[in-house]
Amino acid sequence: MLFLTCHIYLCVAPGNRFLSGLLLSIAPAKAVVPHLQTVFQADAAHMNFGKYTLYSCYGITANCNAFLVAIGIIFGNEDKHGWDLFWKFALKHHPCLNDHRITIITDQQKGITESLQGILPKAVNFFCSFHWRQNILQYIKGGKSDYS
């Protein structure tokens, strides 16, 4: 049997109710997350249905396996508001994430940096080298010659 820690966010307008998000973390994660290695990965991706975005954060076990810290489906595009909801949920259930020894690797997209600075100010945000290179190629147009 698997137990989930779950929050459902409803956006309520007069006369109707609209599901705007679902955030999950498995119950055993409360005991496991404090013992994971101190490097976590976080990312978001657009979903194939509706205008929802999938948010996720994973840690690494001692055996180098990925372990799900938290996951969420939130209505709308990836933005600071969505990351704020996600990180507040993750921090509520895993307060050990807000520690100066924690490094969170992200892709520096759409509000994640500002959200981490506001909600997990002690954690260190490090940018993924793959995405860093993609940004250099796209925005600076560098990296196309031998010594650029």
Language model regions located:
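DNA-binding interface regions
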Residues: 1-148
